Regions:
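Active-site-adjacent C-terminal substructures of enzyme catalytic domains
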Residues: 1-80, 96
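C-terminal cap of metal-dependent C-N hydrolases
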Residues: 67, 71, 83-117
Length: 117
């Protein structure tokens, strides 16, 4: 069984409905996947937040929105950087915000190994 939580839960600092915090689950090694059906941009923000708050290291935080999610949905040709896989990648620049936090800005996108942005 996998634990799937919403990216907005991490970004907001907790559940909007009073349920368990995704960050708390991650802190205890209980978060497998981050997803979002209504704020897809929250996935990148959640990865940055988990790393900046020292809850997960970068590879583990990225895996919650890539490898683990792809594996759980049967998309075995993507989700990690490895020979023979799709090579869907993003390049991100971290921007310092006035409140002391950081925000990820997508600089480049590759789809199936071809740069599209």
């Amino acid at each position: 069984m996998l634990t799937v939580m919403g990216g907005p839960n991490v970004v907001r600092g907790g559940s909007h409905s009073g349920n368990v915090s995704a960050s708390d689950l991650a802190r205890h090694g209980l978060l497998d996947i981050l997803s979002s059906d209504y704020v897809p941009g929250s996935l990148l923000s959640a990865v940055v937040r988990l790393v900046d708050d020292e809850i997960l290291d970068l590879p583990h935080a990225v895996s919650t929105v890539s490898h683990h999610a792809a594996k759980a949905t049967g998309l075995h040709d993507r989700g990690q950087i490895a020979v023979g896989l799709r090579a869907d990648l993003i390049q991100v620049r971290l921007v310092d915000l006035p409140n002391g936090k950081r925000h990820g800005v997508v600089k480049s996108v590759w789809r199936e190994g071809i740069r599209v942005l």
